[in-house]
């Protein structure tokens, strides 16, 4: 019996869902034969915009890439600039960066499990996960004044110290979140419908995952034991005790399990970091780079001039090039930075994990039913703000 290939357009969806992604899917009946992603609907030119701004001015642009994990975007950027400058960040600032990065990992993974579950039809988990995410959003607002685009990290440290009440708010998260994770597992892990929609779906082998350049939970779900925090540590991650979960069956269910364990491990890292937190400075001793204290700006003409010159003219960065990767909740987020000795990046190239992971969608979904494609998109946990930049 002759078959006829049908071409189906999926999307572009509204930005409040997974993002403005369009997939052109070729089907033989309900079986996927080919998938062609169409991207660029959210392109804003962040890389090129950064090359026309000073290093401080370009920092807020990075928030707008993966807007579900803005502090990871900031962290990779400031680490790259600090590597070019050769400056060291104080221990307190480094520890706070780890705390906020792992809180951000929790926040991002909560959105993932909420939307992934909702895509497959489990609305209860969606409501619960967004309830817990709100507590981290309140911490974001407490620390930076913003709920999403935080702009909290600075080249050389942080924009401000932790506010009063932060420690108790974090402790509440440490005490309550493991129980919430148990609830999610109770609702999903042994749910017959969930198992039918995830086990054996979206399979990609370890070799194929490496060949495609997949990273993060999607890579570890395929059985590849690699995590930048452990294998190429930054921000003092080598001082923390945590395990890296890996999958065995390389499918959607394994990627789900990997992220659940990552959430539990993030809680452990935050707990260790809170115990390591000691009083001290939050900015490096580098006045040519770091803004002066507000007291100095408000009370002395020298401090005011110093602040004005850094804000308006920036600071020169030694000529050279660096690459800095960080373990974003979605995978390896990397910054390739080239300096010509001036106050603006000569070239900034971002390696976005969502973009690379999306490239494997045809490999993961070919031969599956069209209804299973939604589950594959959910398990990749992509953000189009990062893909399109």
Swiss-Prot record:
PROSITE patterns: COMPLEX1_49K
EC number: 7.1.1.-
Catalytic activity: a quinone + NADH + 5 H(+)(in) = a quinol + NAD(+) + 4 H(+)(out)
The entry's keywords: Cell inner membrane, Cell membrane, Membrane, NAD, Quinone, Translocase, Transport, Ubiquinone
A Gene Ontology molecular function term of the record: NADH:ubiquinone reductase (non-electrogenic) activity
Any one annotated GO CC term: plasma membrane
Compartmental location: Cell inner membrane
InterPro entries in the record: NADH_Q_OxRdtase_suD (IPR001135), NADH_UbQ_OxRdtase_49kDa_CS (IPR014029), NDH1_su_D/H (IPR022885), NiFe-Hase_large (IPR029014)
Function recorded in the entry: NDH-1 shuttles electrons from NADH, via FMN and iron-sulfur (Fe-S) centers, to quinones in the respiratory chain. The immediate electron acceptor for the enzyme in this species is believed to be ubiquinone. Couples the redox reaction to proton translocation (for every two electrons transferred, four hydrogen ions are translocated across the cytoplasmic membrane), and thus conserves the redox energy in a proton gradient.
Subunit structure: NDH-1 is composed of 14 different subunits. Subunits NuoB, C, D, E, F, and G constitute the peripheral sector of the complex.
Family as reported in the entry's similarity comment: Belongs to the complex I 49 kDa subunit family.
HAMAP family per the UniProt record, alphabetical: NDH1_NuoD
Protein name listed in UniProt: NADH-quinone oxidoreductase subunit D
Gene name of this polypeptide: nuoD
């Amino acid at each position: 019996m002759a078959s006829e290939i049908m071409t189906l357009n999926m999307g572009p969806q509204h930005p409040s869902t997974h993002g403005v992604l369009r997939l052109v899917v070729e089907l033989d009946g309900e079986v996927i034969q080919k998938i062609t992603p169409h991207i660029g609907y959210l392109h804003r030119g962040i890389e090129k915009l950064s090359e026309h701004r000073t290093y401080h001015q370009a920092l807020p642009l990075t928030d707008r890439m993966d807007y579900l994990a803005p502090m990871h975007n900031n962290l990779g950027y400031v680490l790259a600039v600090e590597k070019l400058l050769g400056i060291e960040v104080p221990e307190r600032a480094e520890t706070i960066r780890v705390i906020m990065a792992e809180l951000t990992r929790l926040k991002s993974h909560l959105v993932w499990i909420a939307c992934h579950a909702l895509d497959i039809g489990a609305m209860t988990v969606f409501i619960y996960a967004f309830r817990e995410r709100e507590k981290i959003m309140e911490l974001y607002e407490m620390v930076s004044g913003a709920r999403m685009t935080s702009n909290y990290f600075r080249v050389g440290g942080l924009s401000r110290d932790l506010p009063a009440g932060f420690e108790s708010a974090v402790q509440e998260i440490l005490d309550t979140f493991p129980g919430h994770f148990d609830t999610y597992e109770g609702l999903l892990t042994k749910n017959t419908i969930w198992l039918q929609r995830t086990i054996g779906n979206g399979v990609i082998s370890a070799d194929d995952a490496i060949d495609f350049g997949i990273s993060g939970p999607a890579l570890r779900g395929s059985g590849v034991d690699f995590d930048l925090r452990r294998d190429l540590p930054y921000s003092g991650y080598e001082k923390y005790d945590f395990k890296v979960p890996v999958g065995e069956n390389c499918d959607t269910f394994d990627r789900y399990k990997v992220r659940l364990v990552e959430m539990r491990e993030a809680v452990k890292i935050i707990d260790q970091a809170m115990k390591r937190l000691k009083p001290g400075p939050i900015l490096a001793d580098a006045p040519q780079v770091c803004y002066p204290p507000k007291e100095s700006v408000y009370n002395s003409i020298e401090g005011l001039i110093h602040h004005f010159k850094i804000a308006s003219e920036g600071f020169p960065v030694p000529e050279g090039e660096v690459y800095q990767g960080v373990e974003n909740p979605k995978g390896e987020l990397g910054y390739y930075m080239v300096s010509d000795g001036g106050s603006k990046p000569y070239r900034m190239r971002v390696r976005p994990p969502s973009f690379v992971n999306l490239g494997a969608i045809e490999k993961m979904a070919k031969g599956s039913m069209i209804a299973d494609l939604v589950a594959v998109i959910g398990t990749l946990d992509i953000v189009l703000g990062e893909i399109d930049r």
